[in-house]
A protein has these predicted regions:
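Glycine-centered hinge/linker elements that transmit conformational signals in sensory
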Residues: 17-48
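Short helix-initiation/N-cap motifs at beta->coil->alpha
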Residues: 46-60
Length: 215
């Protein structure tokens, strides 16, 4: 997300085409920003061993100012066994801060519940039935029903009152988005890129320099 906020969505395509490199100047600058935040203690202690539940517990106990996560958390906060903070509307949502103001309304993300249909070794009847089923799953009526139990963002806009103020705020933010991309390695033809990059970034928390991580 930081790279998108610094350079816009073109950075994903440039990395995928090798016009830019993961150990190049632009990306090393992003790793350095991450390292600076780690060294300043923004992410707390033991970040490599801090899991989702620990993060949530710290937030709800007032030991963390914020948590960075996806829009599915709108539903999680509403459906959890302890909804005290949600009920009191003491949780808010905001954009990830931009690095270059030109990319203020650029975000990382994509549609939920995407589907594809394979025709491999399938009859015309099976393919037609699958198309009909997918059309039902992606219809506004179906998505409205899904949103009642799992309030989050979908590929179609819901037409019901979700009863979830966090989701309402998220939708208001997303309505202002100008561009978005999935996680950058998604666009790389190297299928191992995602794991390689995630694993390399962890070294920032163990003392590696930004350039070492890039290399």
């Amino acid at each position: 997300a930081l790279a998108l906020k610094a350079y816009g969505t073109s950075i994903a395509d440039d990395l995928a085409s090798d016009k830019e490199a993961y150990n190049g100047e632009k990306m090393v600058a992003i790793y350095q920003k991450m390292k600076d935040m780690i060294d300043a203690g923004y992410w707390g202690d033991g970040i490599l061993s801090t899991d989702f539940n620990t993060e949530r517990n710290m937030l709800e106990a007032g030991k963390a100012a914020f948590t960075v996560d996806g829009t599915w958390n709108c539903g999680n906060f509403q459906n959890d066994s302890d909804t005290t903070l949600f009920d009191a509307q003491k949780i808010g949502v905001t954009r990830i801060p931009y690095i270059d103001e030109a990319n203020k309304t650029v975000e990382m993300g994509g549609g939920s519940d995407t589907y594809y249909i394979t025709t491999l070794n399938k009859s015309d009847e099976e393919i037609a039935a699958t198309v009909k089923f997918i059309k039902y799953l992606t219809s506004v009526d179906s998505i409205n029903e899904m949103c009642k139990s799992s309030p989050t963002t979908y590929a179609e806009k819901v037409t019901i009152d979700t009863g979830n103020y966090l989701l309402d705020d998220v939708n208001a933010i997303m309505a202002e988005n100008t561009e978005s991309k999935l996680e950058i390695p998604t666009y790389d033809s190297n299928t191992a890129a995602m794991d390689t990059i995630r694993n390399s970034l962890q070294a920032l928390a163990t003392g590696a320099s930004a350039q070492e991580v890039g290399d």
